[in-house]
Each structure stands twice: as structure tokens, then as C-alpha cells.
A protein has these predicted regions:
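A broadly tuned preference for mixed-charge, low-complexity surface segments
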Residues: 51-66, 122-128, 141-158, 167
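Binuclear metal-dependent phosphoesterase catalytic core
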Residues: 2, 91-95, 132-134, 138-171
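Thr-Gly-centered strand-to-loop micro-motif
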Residues: 6, 102, 140-141
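Internal catalytic-core helix/loop-beta-alpha segment
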Residues: 82-129
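Active-site environment of divalent metal-dependent phosphoester hydrolases
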Residues: 10-17, 39-41, 72-79, 106-111, ...
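Hydrophobic/aromatic beta-strand patches that form the interior of the parallel beta-sheet core
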Residues: 4, 32, 67-69, 119-121, ...
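Core catalytic region of metal-dependent phosphoesterases/phosphodiesterases
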Residues: 2-94
């Protein structure tokens, strides 16, 4: 199982259009989005080519391969235009590893959920990283459209062997 993990699109159709291309290029099996799909939020600037409905159409076209975790900028009304479900979190077992997916505003490496896991993926902070802490792996794909702290537009690929943080150029 190969996963494409992205977060924090914030309504940018420019970067959302890259998702199907990255999915195909990486030969991923599924896409997991860690929230903040359509709205840019009051603290963020408008992202490039801001068009929440275009982002929705792109994501709806990928619905068969898509799992989505709700972010702090995602509203209940967003679910009415989306052909996929928004989950509060996901807990999947892949390759005998329990993997917890969340947005990051509630649970992250500093505030752990009650559920036991081996790997936690979360977004929210717009800063990509992969780190180990107390025998657990924490990974953040950064933001596809609005990276912060001098980081790049990025995503994560997870396969049976490793977790890799990549910028949108694929490096």
C-alpha cells in the first residue's frame, strides 16, 4: 500500500490541480488529506488561484481513492458539496503498524490521543517534517498551498518501506 498524504490546500485550485498528477507520478494507491480543504482561514493570505469550488470538483473526481480528515477550517457545509466523507480522525493498520491520521489542531506530537499508535500524521502547522520521539514516528506533510517557516510546498509518500517528505517538484 502506497499512500499520498497531503494537507492544507486552503482552496487553491492551482495546487489542487497537481494532486492527480502527483498521485499518478508517485503510483500511489490512496490519497489521505489531513484537512483544511476549501477555506483559507482568517490568519492566512488568499492562496494562489483561490477557488474552493474548483478544489471540490478536483477532489470529487478522486473520491474513490480519497480519505479525508476534517481540519479546523473545514465547515459542515463543506460536506454538502463533497462526494466523500470527512472524518474526525482515521486509525488504520498498515503493514502491522497502527497509523493515526488527524488534522493536528487537537492532537499532535505534543498532545496525544487516547488511541495507541505507532505513526501519527498531522497537518495544521504548514511545516513539513518527519521525526521520531519516544519510539513513535510523527510526520507532517506541510501545506500543499501555504507553507510556513521557509518550508516548501510539500507532501508525504508512505510505502511499506519508508516515509518520505517531498516538495511538489518531486524531490
Amino acid at each position: 500500500m502506497k499512500l499520498l498524504i497531503i494537507s492544507d490546500i486552503h482552496g487553491s485550485s492551482y495546487y489542487a490541480k497537481m494532486i492527480p498528477e502527483i498521485f499518478k507520478l508517485e503510483k500511489a494507491d490512496e490519497i489521505i488529506i489531513l484537512g483544511d480543504l476549501y477555506y483559507h482561514g482568517p490568519r492566512n493570505p488568499l492562496p494562489k488561484d483561490y477557488s474552493p469550488m474548483d478544489v471540490c470538483n478536483i477532489l470529487n473526481s478522486l473520491k474513490e481513492k480519497l480519505k479525508v480528515v476534517r481540519g479546523n477550517c473545514d465547515a459542515l457545509v463543506d460536506e454538502t458539496i463533497s462526494d466523500f466523507n470527512f472524518h474526525d480522525h482515521l486509525l488504520l493498520t498498515i503493514n502491522n503498524k497502527r497509523i493515526y491520521f488527524t488534522h493536528g489542531d487537537k492532537y499532535n506530537q505534543d498532545v496525544l490521543p487516547d488511541e495507541k499508535f505507532d505513526i501519527m500524521f498531522y497537518g495544521h502547522f504548514h511545516t513539513g517534517f518527519i521525526r521520531k520521539k519516544n519510539n513513535l514516528i510523527f510526520a507532517n506533510p506541510g501545506s500543499l498551498s501555504l507553507p510556513k517557516n521557509n518550508t516548501r510546498h510539500s507532501y508525504i509518500i508512505m510505502d511499506s518501506e519508508k516515509i518520505t517528505l517531498k516538495d511538489i517538484s518531486g524531490s
